[in-house]
Amino acid sequence: MSFDIAKYPTLALVDSTQELRLLPKESLPKLCDELRRYLLDSVSRSSGHFASGLGTVELTVALHYVYNTPFDQLIWDVGHQAYPHKILTGRRDKIGTIRQKGGLHPFPWRGESEYDVLSVGHSSTSISAGIGIAVAAEKEGKNRRTVCVIGDGAITAGMAFEAMNHAGDIRPDMLVVLNDNEMSISENVGALNNHLAQLLSGKLYSSLREGGKKVFSGVPPIKELLKRTEEHIKGMVVPGTLFEELGFNYIGPVDGHDVLGLITTLKNMRDLKGPQFLHIMTKKGRGYEPAEKDPITFHAVPKFDPSSGCLPKSSGGLPSYSKIFGDWLCETAAKDNKLMAITPAMREGSGMVEFSRKFPDRYFDVAIAEQHAVTFAAGLAIGGYKPIVAIYSTFLQRAYDQVLHDVAIQKLPVLFAIDRAGIVGADGQTHQGAFDLSYLRCIPEMVIMTPSDENECRQMLYTGYHYNDGPSAVRYPRGNAVGVELTPLEKLPIGKGIVKRRGEKLAILNFGTLMPEAAKVAESLNATLVDMRFVKPLDEALILEMAASHEALVTVEENAIMGGAGSGVNEVLMAHRKPVPVLNIGLLDFFIPQGTQEEMRAELGLDATGMEAKIKAWLA
């Protein structure tokens, strides 16, 4: 989309943060209004993360106005809220390409702009990185400032508190801004509290506090009295005791939509020494009423008509794999009151909304705490219950030691329902489910299943749920099922594949939902097609049978080739000294960028055309 200067006259003056800082303060509320309208206009045309960015407009303007970015270093946690940041930092005219193949990255990305200090996508990393950046800046000695912006969801993760605990110990000069976007402004936010925040962050208060500490430091009773007096004054109106105990100077909460007030407070805090903590209250979806009323639905949006206030309804076609899982979960829970379901803040994405309503006493959203989710499941299993951890492939990486140490070594019957396995599309490198087969396959006695359609997905979930000799995992992709008939649930024989088609010379061993594409290739090349079903344990007898009766084998998976299912097939053949040639088709050895799933599969040669071309070139 072309930028309409007449529609956004103030925003048109800002092609960089240097130009932003030349604007008079009085024009900034108008700039915020235009920035918010431009965000609505652009995202509604292109799709993308939406409600979070609407809530951080004033904060973004204030931070870039007060701090000398990019010299001063601004870090955004996760990055859903960073669209206004991208618009103000030279990427305004490209914002319509965000999350598209070859377009702007969905999150702050170091390779895209010097303003993006840290590449992000997973939550709760900003403070840890910020401490390192602040320590490096201190050693550099150029008075470079460091600011981290973290949301109220991301700050619940243990990593954020580990970082704050460390910051309180080594006391780097840095600012952490907590963007608290609950549904309404806290009743503490008002004229008195904003005035107090500016007073407590001001130089007079700071110098009096530090001077008083020095004067009375040798008189323990007076020193303790001063400390307690300060805490009591702040404690009457601020909820920052926890952050103060961690060693931060806490200011807030303040109105995160008062851009001029934010600028005053940030200017006061900019030169304070040691770790500083600013708590701001914002409203997710601010300025667009439908998003304010339903920020979860408007968190990430497809293209939509902003005048209608409604997102396009689903065409009502095939169900998603997430829904297939959610329906199976409810069906199983109705028959077995031992079932317990756990998610790390992914209720909607994992298809668990209905379950959470029907079985609230057996539904546990542990927030952004993947490590805790897995070990909590271990505890439930020890207690005689049947835990299911519903988690995205990319987020299970964060709990790898817990899978190993707390579940697998103890052979606990925990079922991992791994959503978003394989290529996920528009969220790019940080969210592709490229590695789960590789990092799970090496865990002793782990059962790993790869369904080829929604019916197999249900059967495998059922099989894993009733497997009591250790952990099991079922991995399935983002997107819709293929439309096969659902049959009554029954346990599958562990470690057994099935031959779907008999051909000649070439056998294709398929792992997972690339099966429809593999079937087209098998038909075209008159190849045998095998649905392997299990990555662990592998059906060694079937692999050896295929090796004995065919001239070559091809493995197909939507996982990294390195260490994946195909690697397992190679290991079986080598262990049995079978000299049959094998072509492994899967995800290559690089981080896969954003694009639609169809675009990226075509580019990587994972559609039928690409697979057939790879096989023919290999056989030539």
From Swiss-Prot:
GO biological process: 1-deoxy-D-xylulose 5-phosphate biosynthetic process; isopentenyl diphosphate biosynthetic process, methylerythritol 4-phosphate pathway; terpenoid biosynthetic process; thiamine biosynthetic process
SUPFAM superfamilies: Thiamin diphosphate-binding fold (THDP-binding), TK C-terminal domain-like
GO cellular component: cytosol
SMART domains linked to this entry: Transket_pyr
Residues engaged in binding Mg(2+): 152, 181
Pathway membership, UniProt: Metabolic intermediate biosynthesis; 1-deoxy-D-xylulose 5-phosphate biosynthesis; 1-deoxy-D-xylulose 5-phosphate from D-glyceraldehyde 3-phosphate and pyruvate: step 1/1
Coiled coil: none
Magnesium keyword on record: yes
InterPro entries: Dxylulose-5-P_synthase, THDP-binding, Transketo_C/PFOR_II, Transketolase-like_Pyr-bd, Transketolase_BS, Transketolase_C, Transketolase_CS
Catalyzed chemical reaction(s): D-glyceraldehyde 3-phosphate + pyruvate + H(+) = 1-deoxy-D-xylulose 5-phosphate + CO2
CDD domains reported in the protein's UniProt record: TPP_DXS, TPP_PYR_DXS_TK_like
Claim: Translocase is one of the keywords in the record: no
MF term (GO), any: magnesium ion binding
EC top class, as a word: transferase
EC number: 2.2.1.7
Residues binding thiamine diphosphate: 80, 121-123, 153-154, 181, 288, 370
Key words, A-Z: Isoprene biosynthesis, Magnesium, Metal-binding, Thiamine biosynthesis, Thiamine pyrophosphate, Transferase
Cofactor: Mg(2+); thiamine diphosphate
Subunit comment: Homodimer.
Family stated for the protein in its record: Belongs to the transketolase family. DXPS subfamily.
Function summary: Catalyzes the acyloin condensation reaction between C atoms 2 and 3 of pyruvate and glyceraldehyde 3-phosphate to yield 1-deoxy-D-xylulose-5-phosphate (DXP).
Record-linked PANTHER family: 1-D-DEOXYXYLULOSE 5-PHOSPHATE SYNTHASE-RELATED (PTHR43322), 1-DEOXY-D-XYLULOSE-5-PHOSPHATE SYNTHASE, CHLOROPLASTIC (PTHR43322:SF5)
The name this protein goes by in its record: 1-deoxy-D-xylulose-5-phosphate synthase
Taxonomic source organism: Escherichia coli O127:H6 (strain E2348/69 / EPEC)
